[in-house]
Amino acid sequence: MDSFDLALLQEWDLESLWGEDILSQRNDSLVLEVQASASRCRSVYEPDRNALRRKERERRSQETQQDSGSFNSGYSLFSEPYKTNKGDELSNRIQNTLGNYDEMKDFLTDRSNQSHLVGVPKPGVPQTPVNKIDEHFGAESRAQPQPSTVCSTASSTPAAVPVQQGKRGAMGWQKAGHPPSDGQQRAAQQGSLRTLLGDGVGRQQTRAKQVCNMETGLQTQERPPAMAAKHGGSGHCVQNFPPSLASKPSLVQQKPTAYVRPMDGQDQAPDESPKLKSSTETAVHCTAYRGVPANKPESARAKAKLAKFSIPKQAEESRSGENNSCVEEIIREMTWLPPLSAIQAPAKVEPSKFPFPNKDSQLVSSGHSNPKKADAEPGSPDNGASNTSTLEDDLKLSSDDEEGEQQAAQRTALRALADSSVVQQTNCRGSAPSSKGGGSSSSSGGSSSSSDSESTSGSDSETESSSSSSESEGSKPPHCSSPEAEPASSNKWQLDKWLNKVNPHKPPILIQNESHGPERNQYYTPPVKDEGQDCGKLPEICQASLRDKELKTTCKEEQRPRTANKAPGSKSVKQKSPPAAVAVTAAALPPAVPSAPTESAPAPTRRSAGKKPTRRTERTSAGDGANCHRPEEPVAPDTLGASVVGPLEPPKTRPCGNNRTGHRKELRSSVTCEKRRTRGLSRIVPKSKEFIETESSSSSSSSDSDLESEQEEYVLSKAPTTTGSEQRLKEAASSNNNSNSNSSTSRASVGSINARTTSDIAKELEEQFYTLVPFGRNELLSPLKDSDEVRSLWVKIDLTLLSRIPEHLSQEPGVLSAPSAKDTDSAPASHALDAPAEKTLPKSKRKRKCDNEDDYREIKKVQGRKESASRLAASTNNTLSGNHCNVNVNSLAIPINKNEKMLRSPTSPLSDTCKHKYASEDLTSSSRPHGNGLLTSASSNKEPKAESQLQTIAGDLTKASHNSSENGTLHSKSRPQTEPWSPGSNGHRDCKRQKLIFDDMPRSADYFMREAKRMKHKADAMVEKFGKALNYAEAALSFIECGNAMEQGPMESKSPYTMYSETVELIRYAMRLKTHSGPNATPEDKQLAALCYRCLALLYWRMFRLKRDHAVKYSKALIDYFKNSSKAAQAPSPWGSSGKSTGSPSPMSPNPSPASSVGSQGSLSSSSGLSPSTIVSIPQRIHQMAANHVSITNSILHSYDYWEMADNLAKENREFFNDLDLLMGPVTLHSSMEHLVQYSQQGLHWLRSSVHLS
């Protein structure tokens, strides 16, 4: 543009445009000058630019006056396109920013400036938004009402000016979206003043009416006519919005925050600024022109916006007087030209309409888009179809910001799903949609009718507010729903993937999620202001009814969900969880609803409002499924899905923070709400309730909460097929309580679960949960809850029916009673112990116990038939008291050991040794994990040799029993009570074989040292060699336990190493007393030798393990040394090295015979390794390291040697060692010291019994 155009634009201030004084002063000369301006416009470059400017101003003022008059006559511009809902606030804001589109339209169409206006304003164009845009407003406003005049003003100027104005206007719009700069604000404000005055005022009026409609459901009638007039006259329609969206992308790019991404913090700030503008402008203009008071939020916006108007101080004062005339003029222009229809092509006028979607549209848009779809489907007259197309277009167009493409695709899918779901919802709740559709001839009419029809039900009351807001969102939905549908989809995707996995049968969840995304918008927008206040009231009432219903239907569930909801409510700040809050809101919304208006605060508040209002809107979505969610949610399944979806999305969003807890709660509440709505899903309610309770118990952990969320989701998905698992669990529990057989039956049905109902329930739940999630299974059920429920069940288990009680697993080994008498006596106490023990036990362990206990029960039944009623307890001296041949006792002992081990494992679940340790006094030593795994495998391998009964049990028992038996029979030296243990295969030994009961009380090294010395002194005093060797071996076992205690104690690792090394020497000495290799060697001798070799092998292995770090260091040091030494001075061959290194002649080197030289040199080097002639000189440090390294590594060699020797001897005594392996679990090189000690003590006890030693 030339300097004249620039000067003209600069001088075209809004002050002149809005200044009443100037207008009044120049009214007389304006007519003539306007005519002259036409010719002068053709000669833009005439020198008298000042005159042109003056004339132009006068012309504009005249046009403004004329337009204002004519505009007043046909004011109805934005009848339907602009929802009266609070979403209009966003519309006003956006229109404030986009309000210049009417003016821009002419320039775009006539000057082909669309590229500038449609696209992001070119930075090259000077952005003097205040003056130029003011001029632009004036020029455009003139251009529309009097394009010829505009053209006459300046043939070239119009083009340049429009371009600049378009650019500046676009930039002004951007800035209007973000009113940071005064000029920008001015431009945006002025442009938006016109657009808003035309569009915004109509919208505000419509909004006010809609608000009233929200409240009364009647005022919408007023608005529809006006809106209809506007709609028909101006051509602005929600339908037009899709084009606006098309142009909007650039606008979105310019200020996406204004309306493109309602969920984003960006729009929130821009929303506030646009809101202020639209509110003040719309409030002032609406009040001035339509006489329609802005809504309370609008008044607030007006206040805020007034503040913003104050920002552009240049034209603000002059504008204030002329605002009305200008606004009227603008409105008239908008009305005159139905430029909106023309602007629709530019697709910016529509964005100007969308401007209101900023927050409200965001909030309402999603909801509205859904309701509109619902309305369209139900057959809502204009808005339904237009909104549906608009929604689709908007979703597609508004998505171009960032996720636009994804959102568009998702929304398209969502629409398809939503359509199907809408059809379902329409079918299910067709009456409400139809009533809404029928009632809503216009968006406001639809809202009023929908509110009327929906006020019928509590949920419908929510629908009412949401539908009205959604209708106001009619134009908004495209932006908001697409942006928010996008966040919703993104949020839902994370959880949707999850839910889809869990509940693949519920695509409605996705639909609902996306709908929730829009619903979030609804949540945010409607609750934010108008709906938050107006609709909030109705929803609150309806919500109260819903609350009553919900309380009735899901009192307990609701309690938990509401508790969760409370958290979400408090977490409403989390904002992203609103969708989840939606579900929660459905459940807990009633309490949250009152806060919805409060939440109408800015974006963050919006999100929080999103939660609480989300509840409202969720109800609205559920209740208004026809309007909001119905399009996307099938009623019953979708409601369920919606509840799931809502939670799912929030969880997705919530993963950001403590949202999980809120999510879980929201899931519960949403589940509750959905359940209420679907009623048919009430069965799910108890199940979810169970899970919720479980979750509440386990809610302490976020993972638990997640799992619980998953559980709920799983429950939702699974609930239709299964009536409440909770009920099943309860029934199973009751059946278990009724009888052990029943409990076992329930276990069988549930899947081998522990005899204890708790384990049944836990396993059942676990199975269900496992289908959901492979991880966190132990956490799915809160151990507290399980333990509580299980306690009664455990107590009800009739222990008297069991000759042996493997369930003592949870008991302390001391509590375990080997004799049947002890079993019966200690059964109650031990059983009581078991309950708490299992409580402590992780779920997995419990499950394991369950499986094992089932097997044990079977074994017990068989054993109960076979076992003799009484068992004798051996004296602490390991004396066999009586021959109690209980073939099954052996198998029973295995389960007992296994169970004991299982119970022990909870103490240190990570260490197999703990499991084995079970009763070992060396609980501290149980930390060693290495031994048990191998033992288990070994035991499983050897177990096939076990009795047929044991083999049948082997599947579960061998695994657990071997592990447990490895550690289960810990040695309690002074307390070796014997249980008659009869291997089924060895009937002759049945009377002799008794199982020792090991006391697993943790004891200090000093205790074991005393015991070892006592046994050693006893052995020293004995004369009989075999008995002496036995006592030495037992003393060695005590020394091993002492070393193990040292190893686990505070003492340095060297102490146990020394103890083990001394023990090795003691065992070797004991073995020398009684040889096993001679022809006179007895089987007992060989058996004792095999046990001693086992001990030696493990001792050496353990010694190496203790010194392994040192060995590694030594190895590295030696390798480095030799590597470096070889490089520094390569050792010469024996015959050539003498002269090289020392220079002194070597007597051997002259010898021609290399052999002699080698021999002599070899002897020389061997005799004196440091001999300089050999270069083998090694530092003392290296020599010592080599020696230590060799001694350490030799332990491995010794270990394997002794192990092979023990295996050879064991093969010669397979019967004995098979029985021992079955009872105690096989010993391997990786067995723990505790297991080794118990294993050896049991074997020594049998040997002592076989030779009748006391």
From Swiss-Prot:
Belongs to the AF4 family. Residues 45-90, 139-190, 261-324, 350-534, 552-752, 813-883, 919-991, 1128-1171 are annotated as: Disordered. Highest levels found in lymphoid tissues, lower levels in brain and lung. One of its GO terms (biological process) is DNA-templated transcription. The gene is Aff3. GO terms for molecular function: DNA-binding transcription factor activity; double-stranded DNA binding. Keywords: Activator, DNA-binding, Nucleus, Phosphoprotein, Transcription, Transcription regulation. It is found in: Nucleus. One of its GO terms (cellular component) is nucleus. Residues 406-418, 441-472, 577-605, 694-704, 732-749, 1132-1146, 1154-1171 have a biased composition (Low complexity). The modification Phosphoserine is found at S782, S908. Coiled coil: none annotated. Residues 67-76, 143-158, 359-369, 421-433, 873-883, 922-941, 960-985 have a biased composition (Polar residues). This is AF4/FMR2 family member 3. Putative transcription activator that may function in lymphoid development and oncogenesis. InterPro entries: AF4/FMR2, AF4/FMR2_CHD, AF4_int. It comes from the Eukaryota. The keyword Repressor does not apply. Residues 45-62, 552-561, 615-633, 857-869 have a biased composition (Basic and acidic residues).
